[in-house]
Curated annotation (Swiss-Prot):
Localization in the cell: Nucleus, Nucleoplasm
Residue ranges with Polar residues bias: 246-260, 274-283
Protein name: Light-mediated development protein DET1
Species of provenance: Arabidopsis thaliana
Source species taxonomy: Eukaryota, Viridiplantae, Streptophyta, Embryophyta, Tracheophyta
Task performed by this protein: Component of light signal transduction machinery. Involved in repression of photomorphogenesis in darkness by participating in the CDD complex, a complex probably required to regulate the activity of ubiquitin conjugating enzymes (E2s). Involved in repression of deetiolation in the developing seedling. Repression of photomorphogenesis is probably mediated by ubiquitination and subsequent degradation of photomorphogenesis-promoting factors such as HY5, HYH and LAF1. Involved in the repression of blue light responsive promoter in chloroplasts. May be required to stabilize the CDD complex.
GO biological process per UniProt: carbohydrate metabolic process; DNA repair; red, far-red light phototransduction
Pfam families, alphabetized: Det1
Family: Belongs to the DET1 family.
Main location: nucleus
Keywords: Nucleus, Phytochrome signaling pathway, Ubl conjugation pathway
GO CC annotations, alphabetized: nucleoplasm; nucleus
Ranges spanned by the short sequence motif Nuclear localization signal, renumbered to the chain: 421-436, 492-510
Length: 543
């Protein structure tokens, strides 16, 4: 109805028109075309902290001290000041106090989370929005050794003496509960080894190949729900131990009935030793691995109707690669819903290195209720890619925060889908393109910003320089432009990290990070060099 697109026209349209069902949030987000962070305060006087992110509801700004010992939480506010200038044509200059960090943020508290030999993992943070709980992690130094102190540990996976997960109430900074993992390895970078779905928490132990499922109670306690790995059901261990004891007692009664000459033979063949120490010499596969092999076997068996062809197919596709399947370890895991997990399998080398592009990988869907594998794909499977292209939002778990449900993806945004198809058509090898796209699966939990300024139906920007993904990027001296989608030639605002006049030293490599508030026209850009001198903090807001 109104094509001008100014704020007055949009407000009037909102008064007289009702948006279609389910489109009220999208209609409201159109206001952000007019409310943009168009003003920048450069090199703001700020505390020397590592600023992590805004929470999903925008109530808190999470930061850590430079020594990675303390958590500092801020409450975003807004710049307020008065002026005696009666001019209506030009904006009055901001007072000097406006160039300070505490004009925009109020410190709520500071809490020491790490002991003397531990450090806070600055790349890890999960937010439970319903109760305003924050999950943090501390750890000791990583030990790079291939020796395994336990027979259950995977050789080649490094060890961390102590990993502590701390559940904290962000309203007042009270520590509610802790969970400690000793001599283990959990990938904490960018929340890769931990996934939060509603009140369920999944923690993947790479070293011991266990998925620890915990429940966050309303009281703030972490309660063990299940551990998936060697055992799949709660009573598996009890059943196996009772069966083992029955077998041992039966074998012992048989041995006692033998003659003295035969007792010496049984003492030499090692049978008793293997039964008395089942854990030390146990060659059984884990419960998850057995279910995976069983699913692969049945899938290959059902491909053919003739028994002769079935045997030939099993020899070629199953038995020939049997050891390769056995050697697979769990790399990453995410919830699809409260009953299903998406598990990524791969080699040991790919699980501990940062770049797993060249390592073979597989995806499995695991039903926690039936303890069965219900689907299995290779990382070059076209059918899995088709699901990923058409239903990407089903892989990114919905959140109770309304802002998180509108993060742009190629399954909910026509512009993102066009960009994906352009990249697909440009690719020389479709198989390599599929592998590259499926690298993002399983998705890291809470790894994208819900800010409307990353909505590609509203703004167009260079995704090589900035995006909704929670990652550091190489800094550029040129400002990042946000251009209107509705008016393709209209520049809405610019974001420039670093000093206003640029840096004199162009040789030093600079990285930057961007923290966008989920619903306010407010953003923080932090620029620093690789050698970590004091950061340059800019605040971008609407005047």
């Amino acid at each position: 109805m109104f094509t001008s697109g100014n704020v007055t026209a949009r407000v009037f349209e909102r008064q007289i028109r009702t948006p279609p069902p389910g489109a009220s949030v999208n209609r409201a987000r159109h206001f952000y075309e007019n409310l943009v962070p168009s003003y920048t305060l450069y090199d703001v006087e700020s505390p020397d902290h590592c600023f992590r992110k805004f929470t999903e509801d925008g109530l808190f700004l999470i930061s850590f001290s430079r020594n990675h010992q303390e958590l500092i939480v801020y409450r975003p506010s807004w710049l307020t000041y008065s002026t005696t200038d009666d001019s209506t044509t030009t904006l009055p200059p901001l007072p000097r106090r406006a160039s300070k960090f505490d004009s925009f943020f109020t410190q709520l508290y500071s809490v020491n989370l790490a002991s003397s030999n531990e450090l806070i993992c600055k790349d890890f943070f999960l937010y439970h929005q319903t109760r305003r709980f924050g999950l943090f992690a501390t750890s000791t130094a990583q030990i790079h050794d291939s020796s395994s102190p336990s027979n259950d540990a995977v050789p080649g996976v490094p060890s961390i003496d102590k990993i502590t997960f701390v559940l904290l109430r962000l309203d007042d900074g009270v520590v509610l509960d802790e969970r400690v993992f000793l001599h283990d390895f959990v990938n904490l970078a960018h929340n890769m080894g931990v996934f939060l779905y509603d009140d369920l928490l999944a923690i993947l132990s790479l070293r011991y190949q266990r998925i620890h499922l915990l429940q966050i109670r309303d009281s703030g306690h972490l309660v063990d729900a299940r551990a998936i790995g060697y055992f799949c059901r709660e009573d598996d261990e009890l059943f196996l131990n009772s069966s083992s004891q029955a077998m041992m007692s039966q074998d012992k009664s048989k041995q006692q009935s033998l003659s003295g000459s035969k007792e010496d033979d049984t003492g030499e063949n090692g049978l008793r030793h293997s039964l008395s120490q089942p854990s030390g010499s146990n060659s059984f596969l884990s419960g998850v691995k057995q279910r995976l092999l069983s699913f692969i076997f049945r899938e290959i068996w059902n491909e053919e109707s003739d028994n002769v062809m079935r045997v030939q197919s099993l020899k070629k596709k199953f038995y020939f690669h049997f050891q390769d399947y056995v050697d697979l370890i769990i790399w990453k895991v995410q919830f699809l819903d409260r009953q299903h997990l998406l598990i990524k399998f791969g080699s040991v080398d790919g699980g501990v290195t940062r770049s797993a592009d060249h390592h073979p990988a597989f995806f499995a869907v695991y039903n926690m209720e039936t303890t069965d594998i219900v689907a299995f794909y290779q990382n070059s499977a076209e059918d899995l890619y088709q699901l990923f292209e058409q239903f990407s939002d089903h892989f990114t778990v919905s959140s109770s925060t309304p802002f998180m449900n509108f993060v742009t993806s190629h399954s909910n945004n026509v512009y993102a889908l066009e960009q994906l198809k352009y990249t697909k058509n440009k690719s020389n090898s479709f198989s390599q393109f599929v592998k590259k796209m499926l690298l993002s699966l399983p998705f890291s939990c809470q790894s994208q910003s819900p800010s409307p300024y990353f909505d590609q139906s509203l703004f167009r920007f260079d995704e090589k320089l900035i995006s909704a993904a929670d990652r550091h990027r190489q800094s550029s001296d040129n400002p990042i432009k946000f251009i209107s989608r509705r008016q393709p030639q209209t520049l809405k605002f610019k974001i420039k990290p670093g000093p206003e006049c640029g840096t004199a030293d162009g040789r030093s490599k600079k990285i930057c990070s961007f923290l966008f508030h989920p619903h306010l026209p407010l953003a923080i850009s932090i620029q620093q060099t690789l050698f970590m001198p004091p950061s340059v903090v800019n605040i971008h807001f609407r005047r």
